[in-house]
Amino acid sequence: MKNENLRLESFEMKNLPLVVDVVEPLWYPPVGDDVFKRFNVEFIVRNNICENDYRFQLVDEAAQNEILSAAFFARKGDYFIVEEWFARESQRFPAKLKKASGMSRTYLTMMDERTLDLMNEDDIKLSLFVSRKPGAGSKILELTCERLKTEGWKNLYLWTDCDCNWQWYIKHGFTLVQEDIYEPFSSENEDYKTYIFKRKL
């Protein structure tokens, strides 16, 4: 993966299955068969993609334009693209399973709103970034942040939780601005912790 062969471009939705492939083993719900599990993971991914021009993919021109990573951002007031898709695709599943997806949506919506409330109009939120190759996640973050800074955005916000490698953000220049416990996902033995980070662009 040489820098001169890398190209940052607008994300193409036809590549969404490649993103889902990466996070599917990490975000499997505890209920349903493999078909539902993948549906629910795609639902979570789509909950992080907005109707805007801040959807990117990093490709390697030396490898037939292979998709190396993807990154999705949200501004205050942006809308996510998931509602119509969910209404259509969820019809094949029973109400019990759709309730599980509803729990995911409640959590995602709450954390998005909590993060957006901390932001100013000239701040932007990193909703999701996914790497398919070692180092490609850091690279797309570097390139997109350069572009965002040039456009005048001031700060980058994101939220994550204890299921993810949240320590990575501390090591890469982000400041922890809020830490909470999400009771519905907590157990007697372990609190389910959520984190909101900020970094100056």
Cite the ranges covered by each PLM segment:
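Conserved catalytic-core motifs of GNAT/GCN5-like acyltransferases
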Residues: 157-159, 175-193
